[in-house]
Structure formats: C-alpha cells, structure tokens
Amino acid sequence: MEMTEMTSVSLKRGSVAIEDNDSVAPAEEAKRQKVSGCCPTTGQDGIENSSLPSSEKVPGPPETAEQGEKNSEVPSEEEEEEDGLSEEEEEEEEEAESFADMMKHGLTELDVGITKFVSSHQGFSGILKERYSDFVVHEIGRDGRISHLSDLSVPVDEEDPSEDVFTVLTAEEKQRLEELQLFKNKETSVAIEVIEDTKEKRTIIHQAIKSLFPGLETKTEDREGKKYIVAYHAAGKKALANPRKHSWPKSRGSYCHFVLYKENKDTMDAINLLSKYLRVKPNIFSYMGTKDKRAITVQEIAVLKITAQRLAHLNKCLMNFKLGNFSYQKNPLKLGELQGNHFTVVLRNITGTDNQVEQAMNSLKEIGFINYYGMQRFGTTAVPTYQVGRAILQNSWAEVMDLILKPRSGAEKGYLVKCREEWAKSKDPAAALRKLPVKRCVEGQLLRGLSKYGMKNIVSAFGIIPRNNRLMYIHSYQSYVWNNMVSKRIDEYGLKPVPGDLVLKGATATFIEEDDVNNYSIHDVVMPLPGFDVIYPKHKISEAYREMLTADNLDIDNMRHKIRDYSLSGAYRKIIIRPQNVSWEVVAYDDPKIPLFNTDVDNLEGRPPPVFASEGKYRALKMDFSLPPSTYATMAIREVLKMDTSIKNQTQLNTTWLR
C-alpha cells in the first residue's frame, strides 16, 4: 500500500453529514450485534443509527406498524414545533455564524482513527455538497431493485372516495371537526349544513368526514327544514383509539406502500410531518432504513390503513416532498430489509486532470475503499459521542452526565448555551431544564430524568433517553476502536490477507491459516467490533485491541456490563468495500447554481437532461455507485479525492461559503 499526500475538498456548511448506507448490519456483518440477547431497533447505519445523539429532537424507537394498529389514528400529543419544510436558505442564514465557530472545535479524521488510503493515485480537490441536490440517494430494496419515483397516479380502487372528498368541506368546518376529533372542546357533535341537498352531495360529506377524521361517525338530520350532516364520537375516546377497522376492505392489503421522494429533510422529520398532515401517529409508518437530511433521497415507506388517495393528496400540500408508486400489500416494511443504497454524487470545481480522475475512479471500482465508520458516527461537537460511550462502559456515570451537560467550546443554539451555563452554575436539573424551550433533545431528556430520579440515580435518569439513542453512544465507542485497529492492521500488513486474519464462513468467523491464505483476498477479511462474543485476529493486532481497551480502563476479556442493555456481544465488519455499479463522467459547466443531472421529479415533469459544453469555466465529477448497508459514502469519496472529510478540516479550508 502506498500512502499519498492528502488533498482537500471544500464543503458547504452543514454538508458533512453525508448519507451513510443505512439499515441493520449487512451480510458481511453476519455476526449480529447483540444487546441483551437481541438486536436493537436500528436505523441509519447498520448496527444502529449513525446520526448520533445531538441537541435535536430525539424521537423514541419506532413501534412496528402492527403495534401501532390499536391506536393508529391517534394524533400525537407532542406535535412538531414546525409544521412544514423550512427553506434551505433560511436555515443557512440562521446558522451561518455559528457553524464555522462550532467546527473550530470539532473532530478531524485523525481523532477517530481514519488515517489510511488504499490507492496510489494523486489526490485532487473538489467541492462536495455545494448544493444538497448534488447528493442523491436511491434505496435498493429487498428485491435488489433501485427505488425510483416514477408514477404519481393512484391505484384504481372502487372503495376509494372521489376527489371531491378533499374539497367539499370548508376550512372552518375542518377546524371544528378536528377539534371534535381531538376532544379539544366540550362539543359532543358538529353539524354541517348541506347547501345543495342531493344524495350525492350528502354521500360525499359523509365520506369526507369519515376519511379525513377517523374515529368520527356521521348521520343525517333534518333541522327546521334544512339537511345537516352531524359528526359525533360513536363510543367516546375509545373510538378514536380504535379507528374504523370495518371500513377497510378485507380484499385490500392492510399496508399502503409508496415511494417517498424528499429534499433536505431526514426520514424521521418527514414521517413526523406526514403524520401531522394525516392526523395519525408516526408509529403506523414503517421503512427499511432512514436517510439523512442534506440530500435528495428516494425510499420506500409503508403505512397502515391509509389510502393511496389520501397520501397522494399530500402532494398538493407539501413542499420538497413527493409520494408515488402506490400499492397495497399485506405486510409492513422492516428495518434492515434493504440491500443497500445507490448514490449519485457531484463533486464540483475539481482540480484533477482527466488522467487523475480516471485513476481514482478505476481504483474505487476495482479495489474499493477502507470501510471506516464515517465522521458523522462520532458527532460534530467538541464532545465526541465515543467519549460518552466509553464512560458508559466504564460505569463512570458522573462523567456521562458531565459530558452530556457541561458547557462546551464552539457555538450552539442560544438556549443550549444558557442551559449548560445554568447546569455548571447550579447543578440544578430543574433550573437547567427551564432554559430549554425544546425538551426532547438529549440534554432535556437527561435533565428530566435527573429531576425525577435525583442526582444519586444517574443510571435511571440516563435511562429516560430512548434506548436506541443510549446505545448509539457505546456503538460510537466500538466504531472508534474499530477504525483505529483497521488503520493499524493496514499499516502492519498492507492490502493482502495474512495468516491470523479473520474471514466469515456463513455467520461464523474463522482464522486464515498459512496453507489457505491464497484462497482469500483482502475483500474477504473482517475485523471485530469489541464485545463478549467475538474472536480477535491471531497476529499483532489482537494485542493492539487489548492495549487500546486497557488504556481506556476496559477489560477485553469481560465486555459484559452490569446493566444488560450495555453488554455488547460485538460484530464483524469487512475492512475493504468494493462498490458496485460504479460509473462516472467529467462535465464542464459555467454556472455553479445549475443542476448537473436530472432528479426523479425532473424526469416526471419531462425536463430534458442538462446539455454540457465541451469546455466551461469549471469542471465537475459526477459519480454513481452502490454500497451495501452500514457503509459510508463519505469514505468512498474520501478515497477518490484523498481528503479529510471532517467538517473541522473543511471549515478551515473553505471559510467563505459558495452560494
């Protein structure tokens, strides 16, 4: 292996959280991560979510759609503070000053063990994610097909109400019905006058109320010579908790599957927004993996007993969202069922020659890249998430509390700064909590726990944080160890399998012996994430694992924790990933703001693909590649450009944002 000089890439603010390949552990991580005897509900990255806990709203672990059926139409008690997609420009303006300051104190790749490259080509620079539309992710489904939004039509279904259902009620009538549905006032019924009294008109109003406001019954009444449709609760609050199962045709699958196209919004925020518009709980939605915010992403979603017609109607209401490719099926989707993701990435204003680009992309196609856990795994603030995870594993609960709540270098939202300052001054969880307008962030949840259980019971207080988010801290520590050990392995033995390396046979890890080393390639070699149910290589790297954990006051021979949730069995992960379906082209352009390829929505609207001149002011590299779950597109791009992908490094390189 040849180490080459690292070059740089300029990044727009906020663009480092590049999509990692989501869902549960992939085939090569066949040794599944076990926590308390079962896999955690997973999200973005494989063993767990890769979007690590931060000072944002933290949704709890999603229930399955089956679990949500009993209360599937109950509006969430805690609605989102925002009811729509905020404009990208507004977000950037709001955060512009704080971001560069915050990133001065962030992590670099060196801090988390990312130090090696596999290729020998000369690196070059480029601008990554100058626009979120320069990064497009298409989910690869269970059947191996890449998800595309290609059809906005609604399946023909005799049971579906007419389009008039969505327009027959006035805004005032909808408001009154919603208040009735949610028991927001003392009214026991709402009467809608039928202006044009025909049977067809009355039928449409009945259908509209029952379709748009599940849990309400309707009847027709004559009042002083006028016809009214009266809406009411048939069985009190139980009707709302147990919606009209009898209204769903038995011949139709219980789940409406659809393709969700979204721009600049992460999956959980998208689900929460859809839930709000549909007036249902988020737990009736299911999906195979979550997608990050700063990108255009296309993925399959399933929802319990919501018609395609209702979903399609949202296309008229929501910006930067499109729903389509509807079908009714018997089963929901499950986390981890996807086969991976296909990425389309534009690197703008590249400096590399055509020959450099060719060498870099051929190396990516033929050799691949080191399967490091990307920077987003470790958080973006001055307190890395792996440090919290290490403290949990050490049973250092006072340190866990301190790391999450103490003041930290770099800019944060003002209310968080005030909350941390109050905590440092008073150590009063109730007083610090009062500084937070949004109490669903990790800090708010921990402070609530401390208020409830007291300062002497930090373990229980920490337990208020949703389980997945707690586990992400310790998974971050495992990832930190794995990155460092893989760098040592490649530094010590290069890019060839050696005796003592580990490979998987089915789900079982075995050692490569001297006489069968030629039967394997570097693409077969795996390395363990530390845990109580893994084996370690039989060469120098085994001792390196032991030394690293010993330095962190952890016993590699006893990775069981006194709290079951934090006893990690470990897992295996391939050290080199070779992307599939790799293609690329270099294009010339003059305007940094023009899109360089069509999206699914562009194609639906019949827009012609961009035409490029043979020469232009700038050059861009357009890359396409597919990755299995639990791999990071950032690390593939890093290998091509020979760059440090950390936000801290890119902020130092690019302090003036290109607009």
Swiss-Prot record:
InterPro entries: PsdUridine_synth_cat_dom_sf, PsdUridine_synth_TruD, PsdUridine_synth_TruD_CS, PsdUridine_synth_TruD_insert, TruD_catalytic. Residues 1-99 are annotated as: Disordered. The modification Phosphoserine is found at residues 10, 125. It holds the Pfam family TruD. Residues 1-10, 39-54 have a biased composition (Polar residues). It is an enzyme of class 5 (isomerase). One of its GO terms (molecular function) is pseudouridine synthase activity. Keywords: Acetylation, Isomerase, mRNA processing, mRNA splicing, Nucleus, Phosphoprotein, tRNA processing. Residues 368-578 form the TRUD domain. Its EC number is 5.4.99.-. The modification N-acetylmethionine is found at residue 1. One of its GO terms (cellular component) is nucleus. It is found in: Nucleus. The active site is at residue 292. Residues 75-98 have a biased composition (Acidic residues). One of its GO terms (biological process) is regulation of mesoderm development. It catalyses: a uridine in tRNA = a pseudouridine in tRNA; uridine(13) in tRNA = pseudouridine(13) in tRNA; a uridine in mRNA = a pseudouridine in mRNA. Gene3D superfamilies: TruD, catalytic domain. Pseudouridylate synthase that catalyzes pseudouridylation of RNAs. Acts as a regulator of protein synthesis in embryonic stem cells by mediating pseudouridylation of RNA fragments derived from tRNAs (tRFs): pseudouridylated tRFs inhibit translation by targeting the translation initiation complex. Also catalyzes pseudouridylation of mRNAs: mediates pseudouridylation of mRNAs with the consensus sequence 5'-UGUAG-3'. Acts as a regulator of pre-mRNA splicing by mediating pseudouridylation of pre-mRNAs at locations associated with alternatively spliced regions. This is Pseudouridylate synthase 7 homolog. It comes from Bos taurus. The gene is PUS7.
